[in-house]
Amino acid sequence: MDMAPDELDELRGSAQRALEQAIDFSFSCQQDDGHWVAPVSADATFTAQYVMFKHAIPALNLDISGAEAAALRHWLLGDQNAAEGSWGLAPGLPGNLSTTVEAYLALRLLGVPSSNPALQQARRFVLAHGGISRVRFFTRFFLATFGLFPWSAIPQMPAELILMPKWAPLNIYVLSSWARSTLIPILVVRHHEPLYPLPNAQSDPNSGFLDELWLDPTNKEVPFAPPLWDMFHGRDRDVVKLAFTLGDKALAQIGGLKKGPQRRLALRRCIEWLLEHQEETGDWAGFFPPMHGSVWALLLEGFSLEHDVVKRGLEALERLAVNDESGKWLQSTVSPCWDTALMVKALCDAGLGLGGAEAAKGNRHARVTTAVDWVRSLQLLGPQGDWRVYSRNQRPGGWSFEYNNTWYPDVDDTAVVVMMLVTHDPAAVESNAVEMGIEWILGMQNHDGGWGAFDTNNDALWLHKIPFSDMDSLVDPSTSDVTGRMLECFGMLLTHRKGGLRLRPELSQRLHESAQKALAFLFREQTASGAWWGRWGCNYNYGTTNVLRGLPAFCGDKEVARAALRAVLWLEKCQNKDGGWGETLLSYGHPDLAGKGPSTAAHTAWALDALLRFRPASDPALQKGVQWLVSNQVPKTEEKRHWASWPSDLYVGTGFPNVLYLGYPFYHHHFAISALARFLDRTDEPDQDRDLPLLMTRHVVTTLTRHDILLMVLGSRGDIDVFLSIAGKLAKNRHRVRVATHPAHQQLVEAHGFEFYDVGGGPDEFAQVLGREPNLLWSVIRGDLGRLRQSLCRTFARFWEAGYGSNNTRNARNADPKANGIADSRPFVADLIVSTPATTVHVHAAETLRAPLVLIAAQPTLPTREFPHVFTMNKPRYSPGSWWNYATFFFLELLNWLAMGSFVNKLRVHTYKMKPLCWVWATQDFLTAKIPLVCLWSSNVVPRPPEWHDEVMVAGSTTLAQVDQFTPPLSLLEFLNADMEKPTVVVSFGSMFIADPPALISAIASAAAQVRAKVVICRSWRWKLESSLASLPSHTYVADAIPHSWLLPRVDGFVHHGGAGHTAAGLRAGVPMLITPFFLDQHFWAAKVHNLGLGPEPLEIMMRAGTVAGIQTHQGKMQFAQSMQDLLSGQYSRRCAEMSERVRAETDGANVAADVIERELGSALARSGHCAVVPALPAQWQHAESGLALCGVAAASLVTSGMLDWDDLDAITRIDWIARRQKDPKSRLHAICFVADWLGHAFGMLLAVAGWLLQLVGDVRSVGRVKPHHNTDPIRLAMMERSMFDLNFAKQGLAEAELKGGAFEELLARRWRAAVAAAFERRMERTGNMLLGEGCQG
């Protein structure tokens, strides 16, 4: 709701006062020579390594009883996370194992005993996370220098790498600038393998120092790389990584090339390189690791501490140290050029540039000009620069990040400096400094159209397979955030008109050409949600806002406008309830957290500055964001502590994702100045946006762009749980989710807030029929499956109708209460279908809806030689590699088509007016079609077979979170806590049909009594057992549904039927499993669990037709008891725990599935485009004559006004399934099908003639081409109904605006006429050009 004029005036006044306070603080911390710089915070790694270095070199005088050591101790202990005793990568993040070990060692070197409570707490954290053997490479490397790791456990790093020519695939210049400058000195250190004394004067791996951090201190020879077999064949299979590891092992066998004649030459080249790259001030690359490593390498090569190079290097290292009230700590780098350029640009945005309204106050103008001159003087115009090695441009002109870094100018810094210069003085657009800076930026563009930070085309990602690369930071590829900054800079220069000054035409043309390549790169990088990933700032917020600031100058292009709109809507959706924006650094490892986190001034300012380029200042969301900045500004007395006018405690800068995060306090300051200044400028402008796009923002646009996603679920409770987990992820992105499934699941679906659609049938039907014959293949052959056909036909028809039909139950509730009315009343037409493979009609429904399809499988369904189709197994064993395995997939699909194909074709032809399909499509084309398939099981259990296509992802398992909602009965707790010396076993057979539950309970209780165990039996069958339960033995407990995630961690064994959900729960809990398979995929999972050593051999004595005859015999009872004894023997516990750890470390499969769904949906919407009349809305229709796309609102309005008829419009095709089938390669089977099809045509014609002659009316199947009937197409009718709804809803949303009566329709009609005229003008122009070309050829 818009603010009243007096409220807006009050907000403007508050924003102006906040801006003034921030400007005053800016000048209060300006340095004497005009520049700005604030300390750059990081984790404890750099301070800890500084302590190690000074301890290793006694001449550096680190006296543990002195003031310096006390200050270092004080800071390290103060940086510890008190809650868990760890040291993390940034405030608010969980502890990091490697950082904690480094801090622990540093404190021990500083004299803190291991008995210190802080170190005791740290020790517990380290051991809980696997111990010291699991630290990253560089931590292991530093530990080796003190003998705490044997050098033989450190990967080889041959110094000969420096000798590789620049054209070689592997040489120092294919590494990123930071990796190159860090690695070269480390090559020297690795050659020397130094061993420095510890406080107890020991440097022997067996000395016992730090043994308290090892799980097994007797074995420190722990390989860094995973086992070779895993890289060759296991879940970590990677040929490149395997080759590097084999090379490393081969080098180790021959002594790492140390004794070769080339080693001395290599070391000399390393030292020459270091000497060449040292700055006059002693710095190397302006970054702690190369500065620290270079001094270290020189000392090992015989340079004395008094040598000028070493002295200057040590002085540069000390300049990174900060002494404040928290103690002494080390910065990773310093950022004066970056800080100053951004600060000046912000101040100029606030009117302090030349001629600005604020510049005349006091001496502000002079102080800003001094800062500009200071930055300008840092332009790098000399011959240095590693960027020259591969850049096609050899002309210098960039700026670096730090005071002294002539070798590594920064693309990002250079663009900001150029914008700063032009913002301060419009005449600078024609200056040499700006032109040379732009020339240098153009020369640094990568072949993919984007920009990295320091190098060109530095994108050899395979380098991350090198054994010592565990931080994924060896290269500097193109990133969206840097590329967006370049476009912002280009856009400013291309639209610059102040004072009649502009860029040279030749340079402008080059900027345009470069920008087109950059835009193409950004289109490829945009995520399905509309956001962009941020490499150098946290994270999707930073990446997205950087790009958005670069797009306005190019939004004349429709593709740019669409990309911008998607990003704007995503950013608006991420706003927190308090009005601000924030994002946790955890989003780098968990993309589902993108845009989520506590509000910060930096994130809020980034969002506001970007959105104010697309939305008016009157937008309520933006005003709420400005109010957050105003309300959260710190008092003036607190500014110096924060180095900002807003809280700066949370880090928002990124060094290396998931490895190093940086705290730039000025980020929370100067970006907020720019945002407030832009808001105030926009409120001064006349509101020129009172046109349709902005009237339809927020409520209307958000509602009408909310996508309909249909989930088709056929199966048991375990199957529906998986889909509800996925539905929860989709609902968070504000999609409308409809779950079509059996009525047995209605209560569960609606309890989770999703719309339910009843398709009939139920899992009990399957269990009763298939329990008689476990092998589905034989069930089909024997005809047993015919009992299900009639029910399945009804169910499949309803699945199809669920994609467009009105809700057949009125109890559906939406998770978003604000959209509840719209979700219930807006006609549903699926924009995307998500289905289990078993629903059969999924691809046909997707074809009729012209919508993308994503399949979700809980068991393997694509052909492979690794195992047979799981539905054809009747024993828990199989032979890998058999041709029969591969054939079973096609054979089963053929039988399925023989059973259901005629019904499917009948629906296709008669109901949906589509062509029928041949059996070859079902048995070959569908199985080999590249339809996205997400496999929800762990790759540790079933790795991805090599035969499967690229669109198949083994995503990991998923669970439906229920623990927080579950309150266990008191009787259950008492049962579990009683007789603790007895092991407890859980027995659950899921949705299996049990004909005689009392007999089953009796058999289970008897077996448990024989092995002296307690047993919890989870029932799901419908049977009144109250009389039987009263006489249960004391060691038996029968319960209804209990969440596996709550119960399984509390027991010692798990007996179940082998369902995919039960198996995944057992794997996650790490509990040994005994599987008694009934039918279908249960035999497959039973075989897998046993083969992996996670439980005893499966029991094959269980039920047929739901009976328990197998275990009621004496032999059956004995076998059941023996298997249960084996289950509880403890021999499977270790393997189960290891598997649990691996499974838990995997990404939640539901997150992967949601990402795939978002990607497919985004791609489909991008193909359909946006409305030619209302660009804010996606297209649903296409005008046949002009080819113009229309949204539902525009189409319904034009039809209602009589300008168009519905027959003039075709539904937009988001995915062309017909064309997709035609692209599939043909086989001999297609030739057979063609002949059969031809004969069918002939036979059909004979039947038609006979029917006409005899005037017979029958169900004669048409096999020819079907012409669509617009008036009877149910999906088209549903789309028309939705379009009329959208029109009425949009008009209601505009009721309070100036467009009343027929003005809305009149505006749409005017836009339509203009769009049609423009379309025909373009067509005539193309026709004229073609005729002109033909005339010239004549």
UniProtKB/Swiss-Prot annotation:
The record marks 338, 401, 536 as: Transition state stabilizer. One of its GO terms (biological process) is triterpenoid biosynthetic process. One of its GO terms (cellular component) is lipid droplet. The active site is at residue 412. The keyword Repeat applies. NCBIfam families: hopene_cyclase, squalene_cyclas. This is Terpene cyclase-glycosyl transferase fusion protein fsoA. The gene is fsoA.
